[in-house]
């Protein structure tokens, strides 16, 4: 192939010597160092507002709102949006409330929550929603209630309430 154009040759000027001193610029102040910002959560941000619905995801006909983890008991289980006796046979279920409103109540059969009675005070419990927002809780109290007092579960006043049958 033939070139379509030939580049022109230009003369490069030679630098000239300067005997006059050049002015030194005044230093500009540097900004003060600041602490490294905390990275934003990986999930979407949420507002702690009563009534806000937790996102869910359907898997095998059941809708899940997140995962409950209790490291000291070696427990990590999915949590279903709505409770029913059928759903309880699959996994723990939300009984009422929301992590977003600060009143989440989760119930489960003893084959999921059977070790709750051995959960130590000050143990850490986490709930991770379907958008990867992580809610950390610390165990402050353990109570036994009568089946007739189930209304106490929904109105416990706690950010998280975990419930199972006693053995």
Each PLM stretch: what is its role?
Residues 1-167:
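Solvent-exposed, non-transmembrane regions of membrane-associated and secreted proteins
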């Amino acid at each position: 192939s033939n070139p379509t154009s030939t580049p022109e040759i230009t003369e490069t000027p030679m630098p000239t010597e300067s005997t006059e001193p050049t002015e030194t610029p005044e230093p500009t102040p540097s900004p003060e160092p600041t602490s490294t910002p905390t990275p934003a959560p990986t999930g979407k941000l949420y507002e702690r507002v009563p009534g806000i619905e937790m996102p869910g995801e359907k898997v095998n006909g059941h809708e899940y709102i997140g995962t409950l983890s209790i490291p000291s008991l070696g427990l990590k289980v999915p949590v279903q949006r709505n409770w029913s006796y059928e759903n309880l046979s699959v996994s723990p279920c939300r009984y009422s409330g929301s992590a977003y409103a600060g009143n989440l109540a989760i119930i489960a059969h003893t084959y999921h929550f059977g070790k709750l009675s051995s959960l130590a005070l000050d143990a850490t419990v986490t709930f991770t929603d379907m958008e990867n927002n992580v809610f950390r809780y610390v165990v402050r109290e353990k109570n036994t209630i009568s089946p007739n007092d189930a209304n106490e579960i929904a109105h416990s006043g706690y950010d998280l309430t975990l419930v199972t049958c006693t053995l």
